[in-house]
Amino acid sequence: MNKTELINAVAEASELSKKDATKAVDSVFDTILDALKNGDKIQLIGFGNFEVRERSARKGRNPQTGEEIEIPASKVPAFKPGKALKDAVAGK
């Protein structure tokens, strides 16, 4: 499912217009993004957690030359599914 399909599903399930569903979906995504940029953790009980994780510096290799390079530390977004989401996907 892509973003357009998600918006259509939200519009249908909530009886919103596609315009209002688009605003709602975009607002949720923007709010999650802003929270992660600020270093906050988003906890949606039963669904899962969005957070920023630190990836430490490490050594890598240039695949074209084989030269060893240093990959700097970085921050990456992460999602950890909650128990209810895991159970629903597993059919429990």
Swiss-Prot record:
Deleted gene: phenotype: Essential, it cannot be deleted; upon depletion cell growth slows.
GO CC terms of this entry: cytosol; nucleoid
Cellular compartment(s): Cytoplasm, Nucleoid
GO molecular function: DNA binding; structural constituent of chromatin
Phenotype upon changing residue 86 to Q: Disrupts interaction with Bacillus phage SP01 Gp46
Superkingdom of origin organism: Bacteria
The family this protein is said to belong to: Belongs to the bacterial histone-like protein family.
The protein's assembly and partners: Homodimer.
Name this polypeptide is given: DNA-binding protein HU 1
Upper taxonomic lineage: Bacteria, Bacillati, Bacillota, Bacilli, Bacillales
